[in-house]
């Protein structure tokens, strides 16, 4: 848990998920492998997804539970360090010039999409209220 909670940067998550496979796993899934000291690396894309959807969530939840501002700040800093996601929801926001600069912002746009846009709750959306206040 301490390794997960300590992640503040994208590279910390990448390092967390880089490790050596034990003899058991190498021998079990790679029976013809001659070198049992094989390092397995998760790619950067999957590492980023783990940072967004696992590491930051666990750190934030545990920080909230234990009232640790340090853990909450670590989770926030991590999301700010990871690039924005690139999925259909974020592409839709990009098409109207709501560009997410990092995962923190893309998660906010994703939340708006799933809670308001998809459910047809446009009039309840905080963004709609903001646009109306500014006469847009």
Residue ranges, per PLM feature:
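Acidic, carboxylate-rich catalytic segments that either coordinate divalent cations
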Residues: 98-136
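Hydrophobic, aromatic-lined core segments that form the binding pocket/scaffold
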Residues: 1-107
